[in-house]
Amino acid sequence: MRTLWIVAVCLIGVEGSLLEFGMMILEETGKNPLTSYSFYGCYCGVGGKGTPKDATDRCCFVHDCCYGNLPDCNPKIDRYKYHRKNGAIVCGKGTSCENRICECDRAAAICFRKNLKTYNHIYKYYPDFLCKKESEKC
């Protein structure tokens, strides 16, 4: 519970669905979303280019693509609601944009959990300048 409180305090002031996404990541992986995923590999965090470094980084690449398929939505600003049912993330009833953003975040959080065994601390604070290749297509 203390970890949830610390993450919530760290995320105060973060706009939109980033708060919900961070909570999903914490709940699914047990990892602090800010320190474990914000700078991971070539795609986790702001922007992205090159080839994903591993399965976790690919989760971020796919998440970026998912957001890219929402041109009429504001994924980093629009808030949504979700809950858990039998341990699974269930996106709440909201607007079409809110639901699609939630589904993108849900898929990424589940992807992170499924790839916890291959999470590589070498990529935790990976420098952007090492991500040189042209980005893959979504």
From Swiss-Prot:
Signal peptide: 1-16
Pfam families xrefs: Phospholip_A2_1
Cofactor binding note from Swiss-Prot or TrEMBL: Binds 1 Ca(2+) ion.
Cofactor(s) of this protein: Ca(2+)
One example GO MF annotation: calcium-dependent phospholipase A2 activity
Amino acids binding Ca(2+): 43, 45, 47, 64
EC number: 3.1.1.4
Entry's Gene Ontology BP terms: arachidonate secretion; lipid catabolic process; negative regulation of T cell proliferation; phospholipid metabolic process
Catalytic reaction(s) noted: a 1,2-diacyl-sn-glycero-3-phosphocholine + H2O = a 1-acyl-sn-glycero-3-phosphocholine + a fatty acid + H(+)
CDD domains: PLA2c
Superkingdom, natural source: Eukaryota
Coiled coil regions in record: none
Keyword Membrane: no
Disulfide partners: 42-131, 44-60, 59-111, 65-138, 66-104, 73-97, 91-102
Sorted UniProt keywords: Acetylcholine receptor inhibiting toxin, Blood coagulation cascade inhibiting toxin, Disulfide bond, Hemostasis impairing toxin, Hydrolase, Lipid degradation, Lipid metabolism, Metal-binding, Neurotoxin, Postsynaptic neurotoxin, Secreted, Signal, Toxin
Family of this protein: Belongs to the phospholipase A2 family. Group II subfamily. D49 sub-subfamily.
Protein name: Basic phospholipase A2 vurtoxin
Species: Vipera renardi (Steppe viper)
